[in-house]
Amino acid sequence: MNKAHLDQPLFKLDNFSFMYNTSETASIHQLSLSIYENDITILMGASGSGKSTLALCLNGLYPEAVEGTTKGNILYKGKNIAEYPRGIINQEVGIVFQDPESQFCMVRVEDELAFVLENLAIPRSEMKKKIKKVLQQIGMLEYIDADIHRLSGGQKQKIALASVLLMEPKYIILDEPTANLDPMSRLEFIELIIAIQKKTNTGVLIIEHQVDDWEMYADRLVVLSKDNHILIDEKPETAFQLHQNMLRNQQIAIPMKYLDNQETIKKVSHEKSMPVCLEVHHLHYYQKKSAILKDISFSVKQGEFITILGENGAGKSTLLQCLIGLKKYHNGNILFQGKDLQAWDRKILSKHTGFVFQQPEHQFICDTVFDEVAFGMRLNNYTTSEINHRTISLLQAFRLLDHQWKNPFTLSGGQKRRLSVATMLDETPDLLLFDEPTFGQDAHTTKELMNMILELQAQGTAIIFVTHDMDLVDTYCERALVIDKGSVRFDGNPQSLWNQKELLQDTRLREPYRVRESVKREVVHMQ
């Protein structure tokens, strides 16, 4: 550990194990760990190492909310967590998930926050004051009457945090809270958490795969191994400096500032002579008379890799869904392989295209992981031998073979994401669209996925890729399209984009680490 504590730990885990009844192996295995009330602790581990399960056990939701068994003990304030009256732990240990919508019950912001206070039996006469106070605290007072579904991802995450803060928790758990946020919303959310922590002295547990923007604030780094044991428990700086090989072996992303040599990936460049795969002409899309997409025009060639960037709520996901025919646009037209998109037979179109959703659960329709991957092949009349061979190959490539007979909805967040990508790769499609496919993924899986995408690109598949990861864009992508308030603000090489400071600021983007460090070195040299 990083510092001596004379006080009693807030949490004390003593050989604690948790196993889902549907699993043959424990998700958490004999963990012994002390967590202190005022510390900022980062929890890292490969996808499926038990991080989220541990968070839900600390919060008191598990094992009560699922079918699972525990061994050992979790003590909270020196008392076994199971001995507390129902609801006490949930109130004192707040949790914010990576998908804020999974926490919302109401339509309007004020009603959502009032619902929390009603459950705490707060008199109605006091509610308005408390709601305004917490919204003021997170900088969202002007949205008190807003519909939650109209808020951006960053704004929704702040409302989820406000719901937790209203309970005046003793401890806050953040389970990948910035995974879906644009670069500036991510920084703002982190700064908000740190400001709240300093003001209230509330302890925070941060579960993340990428901690470049968090680690400077943390007192402690705890790393769970792939076999669900504690591998590292010390200061982040010490761990990232001294244990890089160990962390890489455990598929942990090391913050870039600790890496001496940045890996260089050779980008796959499409042949300029390749035919056009997709054409978009003056596309407009409206929602309740509001223009979500305005006069969008661009084209994509076979074998081209385009990333679509923009702040939360800019229209990126809507554009992807229009491009694949999931949303019906109102003006303009889209041509795929020279033919109007709306004229294509849906079954034939699905053979040539693939779409990976932002939320993996939105595309699951089968009871087992194996059947989920095999589903498209069965629709396309593959032989049983072909289905078995191809499905097993994909499950191995995405490290899901050991989970092939599980229900997709019981997988970890990272495993669900890998499955959602695998289901789209039963053939080599002409066009693949990805909506933030790397969020929630460990470093190893992200690299594997990107290598697989580069292989598809080299075979002629056109790739359209939405992401908030600027380092990933800098490393892999040859062309960037920036959407701002529904319109195209930039279309060109990412290297050109990094030089346009005003545009980056307007669209809430950020230079990748490589560029930021280069600028710092130039400033130091000039001094």
UniProtKB/Swiss-Prot annotation:
Protein's cellular compartments: Cell membrane
Disulphide linkage map: none
UniProt topology in membrane: Peripheral membrane protein
Residues involved in ATP 1 binding: 45-52
Family: Belongs to the ABC transporter superfamily.
Stated name of the protein: Putative ABC transporter ATP-binding protein OB0804
GO molecular function: ATP binding; ATP hydrolysis activity; ATPase-coupled transmembrane transporter activity
Annotated binding of ATP 2, by residue: 310-317
Keyword annotations from UniProtKB, A to Z: ATP-binding, Cell membrane, Membrane, Nucleotide-binding, Repeat, Translocase, Transport
Role summary: Probably part of an ABC transporter complex. Responsible for energy coupling to the transport system.
Domain ABC transporter: 11-251, 278-510
Top-level taxon in the UniProt lineage: Bacteria
Transmembrane segment boundaries: none
Keyword Cell membrane: yes
Enzyme class: translocase
Organism field: Oceanobacillus iheyensis (strain DSM 14371 / CIP 107618 / JCM 11309 / KCTC 3954 / HTE831)
A GO cellular-component term linked to this record: ATP-binding cassette (ABC) transporter complex
Enzyme nomenclature, EC number: 7.-.-.-
